Swiss-Prot record:
Record-given protein name: Protein FAM76B
GO annotation, biological process: mRNA stabilization; negative regulation of inflammatory response; negative regulation of macrophage activation; negative regulation of protein export from nucleus
Gene encoding the protein: FAM76B
Organism: Homo sapiens (Human)
Main location: nucleus
Regions of compositional bias (Polar residues) in chain numbering: 228-243
Record function comment: Negatively regulates the NF-kappa-B-mediated inflammatory pathway by preventing the translocation of HNRNPA2B1 from the nucleus to the cytoplasm. Inhibits the PI3K/Akt/NF-kappa-B pathway-mediated polarization of M1 macrophages by binding to and stabilizing PIK3CD mRNA, resulting in increased levels of PIK3CD protein and increased levels of phosphorylated downstream target AKT which leads to decreased NF-kappa-B signaling.
Bias (Basic and acidic residues): 215-224
Residues with the Phosphothreonine modification: 215
Biased composition, class Basic residues, residue ranges: 167-189
Chain segments carrying region Disordered: 144-243
Length: 339
């Protein structure tokens, strides 16, 4: 037998059979595990992860160095708005296709009508970028499942046909030998009585029935053996499950980062409010102390004025009493001196 052709992995350049390499980037199983395809935490586009700590694509890393951390886009809510309030994808789509419309899947106003060419790929639905990616991923998975089922069915049918071909010559030879025996012994059977002929027919019918019962017992063994297509499909499904897990982990990391940012923003707002409250309390206490000092000074001044007025009133009363007494003395003296 000729040796099967080997193909090089695009990452480690080691040679493997074609079935062991991935369909898209022709990577081996070890490279797929070491460098999985994950989604960027900012722009949500898929890229090959160089290290486990790297969760941002090269383009977003350059933009972070140049413009700083991005903000969420006002249309798609993806944290990729490095310049302004819109991400680069939404700005380009708005220039090309007009204002955004509501997505039929996520109900957000972030879907751009790409006319017939774009809708033809998603069965005539108006979807945003993230929803189109998820829809295409589901379609790809269903196609792969159908292919794996078809390959397993074809391999099982081909193996059963080869097994039948192996048994067919023996059966033909047995049938030819049986026919020769039947033709040679036909002359002998013709000389037998009808009862003996009936017994011979029963024996031949039993032997043929035993042969028919023995042949199907061998088929389940062949069907129980897994074909190469099934094993490769199982490996592909396991690899796709691993990539899905990495995607889920990156999504969870993104959610954790967004929640941390929200917590930081809320903490900052709480600190600012606390500062304002302390400033207002200090101002209130200062104003209250000033008012109290003013009230005390006014009360003291009022008491002093009241005391002064009371003292003056007393003096005036004394003067009035003295004047009234002097008048009385003057009147009595004038009465005594008169004849």
């Amino acid at each position: 037998m000729a040796a099967s052709a080997l193909y090089a992995c695009t990452k480690c350049t080691q040679r493997y059979p074609f079935e062991e390499l991935s369909q898209g980037q022709q990577l081996c199983k070890e490279c797929r595990i070491a460098h999985p395809i994950v989604k960027c935490t900012y722009c949500r586009s898929e890229f090959q992860q160089e290290s486990k700590t790297n969760t941002i694509c090269k383009k977003c890393a350059q933009n972070v160095k140049q413009f700083g951390t991005p903000k969420p886009c006002q249309y798609c809510n993806i944290i990729a708005a490095f310049i302004g309030t819109k991400c680069q994808r939404c700005t380009n789509s708005e220039k090309k296709y007009g204002p955004p419309q509501t997505c039929e899947q996520c109900k957000q106003q972030c879907a751009f009508d790409r006319k017939e060419e774009g809708r033809r790929k998603v069965d005539g639905k108006l979807l945003c970028w993230l929803c189109t990616l998820s829809y295409k991923r589901v379609l790809q998975k269903t196609k792969e499942q159908r292919k794996s089922l078809g390959s397993s069915h074809s391999n099982s049918s081909s193996s059963s046909l080869t097994e039948k071909d192996q048994h067919h010559p023996k059966h033909h030879h047995h049938h030819h030998h049986h026919h020769h025996r039947h033709s040679s012994s036909h002359h002998k059977i013709s000389n037998l009585s009808p009862e003996e002929e009936q017994g011979l027919w029963k024996q031949s019918h039993k032997s043929s029935a035993t042969i028919q019962n023995e042949t199907p017992k061998k088929k389940p063994k062949l069907e129980s053996k897994p074909s190469n297509g099934d094993s490769s499909s199982i490996n592909q499904s396991a690899d796709s499950g691993g990539t899905d897990n990495f995607v889920l982990i990156s999504q969870l990391k993104e959610e954790v980062m967004s929640l941390k940012r929200l917590l930081q923003q809320r903490d900052q707002t709480i600190l600012e409010k606390d500062k304002k409250l302390t400033e207002l309390k200090a101002d209130f206490q200062y104003q209250e102390s000033n008012l109290r000092t003013k009230m005390n000074s006014m009360e003291k001044a009022h008491k002093e004025t009241v005391e002064q007025l009371q003292a003056k009133n007393r003096e005036l009363l004394k003067q009035v009493a003295a004047l009234s007494k002097g008048k009385k003395f003057d009147k009595s003296g004038s009465i005594l001196t008169s004849p």
